[in-house]
A protein has these predicted regions:
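Transmembrane helical elements of multi-pass membrane transporters/channels
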Residues: 10-25, 194-209, 213, 222-297, ...
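N-terminal membrane topogenesis motif
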Residues: 1-26, 75-82, 222-238, 312-316, ...
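Helix-loop junctions and terminal segments of transmembrane helices
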Residues: 58-74, 273-315, 370-373
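Interhelical loop/hinge segments that connect adjacent transmembrane helices in multipass membrane
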Residues: 1-3, 7, 174-193, 206-246, ...
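Interfacial segments at transmembrane-helix termini and the short loops linking adjacent helices
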Residues: 103-122, 264, 329-359, 365
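Membrane-proximal transmembrane or re-entrant/amphipathic helices at the cytosolic face
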Residues: 453-495
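Signature of the first transmembrane helix
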Residues: 3-63, 91-103, 125, 160, ...
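Hydrophobic alpha-helical transmembrane segments
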Residues: 120, 150-213, 385-390, 404-425, ...
Length: 495
């Protein structure tokens, strides 16, 4: 139980930076959707889909590889870190140089011939973020969650501050005293300033992480790197397939919609409503940051029965909290929808589908521990490729007829298939007796409460939200009672 408390503590700290950071970024969505029409916001969504894919490729699974080998008694952790750092620095630099050389054909292939500067800025951002992934991983390895959180939050704060400066303050200054900022501000640059802000904040993050790149002897162990790449290569394929499962729909959507002139509009609508489901993504991300170091340290230190129980408990509480998040977002959607402009409301129907898809992905991530601990990472690659096949097939089949709804359906089917496949194979290769009856119980309770809350015949929105709050309290009460979690005495009226 102590290990679960440690995991919960780290999840809370990592989650604070992840949740606050993503929430602050989330708060930018109203600004973007109010300032830019759907077709322009669609360009932002479209380009960041490529960014997510490029970042996975440029880190090539080295974060997980670092945790695996740094916790290996036969390897020197600092040599592992140094080798990883040098490797990422080399590949990130090479990526940036090659992109600058071939910027014209790359921009054309991305339908960005008119704005190659967008591509260059995002490429530099990706190169820096890929490299700094290793210092961030080192902070996690050292259990320096607070330092990790502070750097992340400063990065996000600067990014948001620059967005507000360029998009809101600069137009005001330019209208009154244009000569004061005309040397760097272009009024018509629009969404380009979103990319400028991101690039500057990434450079600042690199500077803040310099202490994690000093104070040790740099060593490059080629044989160690070969072993790490052999371990991490399947994770790269897994990561590429996984991120394509998350972003490929937004890349494919403009190519598959029946009305090409409406393509970026649909991407913008879908991307904005996808952001509403970010709460589930935030929780999964926070859990992931704490979970990977946790499972490797448990595997190294705990006995078999204790570590297996820890894995089972982690899955149980993950499912409970995820279902609670799902109900919360869906019950308060009448309020949360105002995080996007009314012109984007037509896409709200995708929110419950995307929320469940992200829940399935979170469970899949929890299940992934068996092939990481047994060095059978090729299975993660197989599952992700299976999911990618489902994503591509269903997008091609559904998007021409259903538009972005086809993307949402493809997403939930993709993660559902991956989740089931990982569970079935894992039962045979690394048996963990997950409490399926308990998971089924909470799923049924969640489904019943969801149906009651959504289809409740109440017209008054305030009353409706109050009743839905009661339903949320019912779910929490059931979980507390079933899991024998004591309430604080002051809440239950005891002295």
């Amino acid at each position: 139980m102590a290990s679960i408390k440690s995991l919960a503590k780290d999840t809370a700290v990592y989650g604070l930076s992840s949740i606050i950071g993503r929430f602050l970024n989330w708060c930018m969505v109203p600004l973007y959707t109010l300032m830019f029409p759907a077709e322009e916001y669609g360009v932002v969504t479209y380009l960041y889909s490529y960014v997510a894919l490029a970042l996975i490729i440029l880190t090539y699974g080295m974060e997980t590889g670092f945790f695996r080998f740094a916790n290996n008694n036969s390897d020197n952790p600092m040599r592992v870190y140094s080798t990883s750092l040098i490797s990422l620095a080399t590949t990130s630099t090479l990526f940036m140089v090659l992109l600058c050389i071939f910027i014209s054909p790359v921009s054309k292939a991305m339908n960005m011939s008119a704005n190659p500067d967008y591509v260059i800025m995002l490429a530099l951002t990706v190169a820096i973020d890929a490299f700094t992934a290793m210092p961030f991983a080192y902070l996690r390895y050292q259990n320096r969650a607070m330092r990790f959180a502070v750097v992340r939050l400063i990065n996000i704060g600067v990014n948001i501050g620059l967005n507000l400066f360029f998009l809101l303050l600069c137009p005001i200054i330019y209208n009154k005293v244009p000569e004061a900022i005309s040397w760097f501000y272009i009024p018509d640059y629009g969404i380009g300033y979103i990319f400028v802000a991101n690039m500057i904040s990434s450079v600042l993050t690199l500077v803040m992480l310099v202490p994690q790149m000093r104070g040790f002897k740099y060593e490059f162990d080629y044989q160690l790197l070969r072993r790490m790449i052999k371990y991490s290569l399947p994770l790269l394929v897994l990561g590429v397939a996984g991120i394509m499962n998350q972003t490929f729909d937004k890349i494919l959507l403009p190519e598959l919609v029946s009305d090409a002139s409406n393509a970026m509009h649909q991407v913008g609508i879908y991307g904005a409503n996808y952001k509403i489901a970010i709460v589930m993504v935030m929780f999964i991300q926070a859990f992931r940051f704490a979970y990977e170091p946790f499972i490797f340290s448990q595997n190294k230190q705990a006995n078999d029965s204790d570590k297996l129980k820890s894995y089972v408990d982690a899955m149980k509480y993950f499912i409970i909290f995820s279902l609670l998040i799902f109900l919360t977002v869906m019950f308060y959607l009448p309020v949360l929808k105002y995080f996007i402009a009314p012109a984007y409301f037509e896409g709200l129907k995708v929110v419950p589908i995307i929320m469940l898809a992200e829940l399935f992905f979170g469970i899949f991530f929890n299940l992934s521990l068996w092939y990481k601990l047994t060095d059978q990472t090729q299975w993660g690659m197989y599952f992700s490729l299976l999911g990618l096949a489902v994503t591509v097939i269903l997008n091609v089949a559904l998007v021409p007829r259903m538009g972005y709804m086809g993307c949402a359906i493809a997403a939930i089917c993709c993660y559902g298939v991956m989740m089931v496949a990982s569970y079935v194979v894992g039962r045979k290769r690394y048996p963990i007796n997950y409490d399926m009856r308990n998971a089924a119980f909470y799923s049924v309770v969640c489904c019943l409460l969801y149906m009651i809350g959504i289809y409740m015949p109440v017209d008054n929105e305030i009353v409706l939200l109050a009743l839905r709050t009661v339903l949320l309290a019912v779910f929490v009460a059931i979980a507390l009672r079933r899991e024998n979690i004591p309430l604080p005495k002051r809440l239950i009226g005891k002295k």
